Swiss-Prot record:
Lineage: Bacteria, Pseudomonadati, Thermodesulfobacteriota, Desulfovibrionia, Desulfovibrionales
Family membership: Belongs to the GatC family.
Protein name in the entry: Aspartyl/glutamyl-tRNA(Asn/Gln) amidotransferase subunit C
Function in brief: Allows the formation of correctly charged Asn-tRNA(Asn) or Gln-tRNA(Gln) through the transamidation of misacylated Asp-tRNA(Asn) or Glu-tRNA(Gln) in organisms which lack either or both of asparaginyl-tRNA or glutaminyl-tRNA synthetases. The reaction takes place in the presence of glutamine and ATP through an activated phospho-Asp-tRNA(Asn) or phospho-Glu-tRNA(Gln).
InterPro entries: Asp/Glu-ADT_sf_sub_c (IPR036113), GatC (IPR003837)
Keywords: ATP-binding, Ligase, Nucleotide-binding, Protein biosynthesis
Length: 94
C-alpha cells in the first residue's frame, strides 16, 4: 500500500505541521513501510485465539481508603518559597 505526498500534506495539516517537499517524500515512504507491515500482520491467522487486552495477567487489588497524615503543615510550608503560615503564596496570574 502506498501513500501520496498529498496525503502526507493533509495529515501534516491536521497536525498543524509545515513540511517541505523532501520531508513529504520521506514521510510518504515511511508511512508506506508502516502500512506494509500492518498488511503483513493482517495476514496472520488468529482464528481460535482469544483477544488479548493486556500482556500482563493481573487483578486489580482494592484496599480501604484510610486517612494518613504524612507531613505536618509546617513541614509542607517549609518547602514554599513564600507562605503566610497557612497557605502557599503564588504570583497573581489574572
Amino acid at each position: 500500500m502506498s501513500i501520496s505526498k498529498e496525503q502526507v500534506a493533509a495529515i501534516a495539516g491536521l497536525a498543524r505541521l509545515q513540511l517541505d517537499e523532501d520531508k513529504k517524500e520521506l514521510f510518504a515512504g515511511q508511512f508506506a513501510q508502516i502500512l506494509e507491515y500492518m498488511d503483513t500482520l493482517n495476514e496472520v491467522d488468529t482464528d481460535g485465539v482469544a483477544p488479548l487486552y493486556s500482556p500482563v495477567q493481573h487483578a486489580t487489588v482494592y484496599r480501604e481508603d484510610e486517612v494518613q497524615r504524612h507531613c505536618s503543615r509546617e513541614q509542607v510550608l517549609a518547602n514554599a518559597p513564600e507562605e503566610d503560615g497557612t497557605f502557599f503564596i503564588v504570583p497573581r496570574i489574572v
